[in-house]
C-alpha cells in the first residue's frame, strides 16, 4: 500500500527484440522483502493504429497467475508507459525509461480508484516497485 516502505534489493532486466524487431521482450527479476525472489515478463508491440502499444504482462508477485493485457504509448525520449485495469477500477501502470545510456529504469504504480480513496490514502497512482539497472 502507499504507506509501505521501500526495500532495496538487487534487480536485473534483459531487453530483447523478437519477431523481426516488431516485439520487445523485457524479462526482469527482483526481490520482495518477505517473499523472496520474484520475476516477470513484458512483451510489447505496436497496436493496430500504429501509434499505440499493446503488451502482455505477468509478474510472479504483482500479477499472477493470469497474465494481464496492457495498452499505452511511447513517451518523450526512450520511454514507454503501459496501463491496464485488473478489477473494480484498480489499475497497474508500468513505465520503462531507457533515456539514459547507462541505466534502464522500470517503475510499477498501483492506481487507486477514486471510490477507494480515504482520508489517509489518496486516489491515484503510487509506486510499488522502482527498478534501476546498469546497461551492459
Task: Write out the residue ranges for each language-model feature.
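Hydrophobic small-molecule pocket/channel-lining residues, especially in calycin-type beta-barrels
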Residues: 1-136
Amino acid at each position: 500500500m502507499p504507506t509501505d516502505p521501500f526495500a532495496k534489493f538487487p534487480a536485473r532486466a534483459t531487453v530483447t527484440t523478437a519477431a523481426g524487431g516488431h516485439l520487445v521482450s523485457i524479462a526482469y527479476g527482483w526481490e520482495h522483502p518477505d517473499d523472496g525472489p520474484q520475476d516477470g515478463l513484458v512483451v510489447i508491440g505496436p497496436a493496430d493504429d500504429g501509434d499505440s502499444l499493446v503488451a502482455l504482462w505477468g509478474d510472479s508477485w504483482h500479477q499472477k497467475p493470469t497474465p494481464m493485457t496492457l495498452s499505452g504509448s511511447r513517451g518523450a525520449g526512450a520511454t514507454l508507459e503501459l496501463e491496464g485495469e485488473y478489477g473494480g477500477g484498480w489499475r497497474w501502470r508500468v513505465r520503462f525509461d531507457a533515456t539514459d545510456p547507462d541505466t534502464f529504469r522500470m517503475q510499477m504504480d498501483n492506481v487507486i480508484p477514486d471510490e477507494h480513496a480515504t482520508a489517509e490514502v489518496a486516489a491515484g497512482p503510487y509506486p510499488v516497485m522502482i527498478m534501476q539497472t546498469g546497461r551492459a
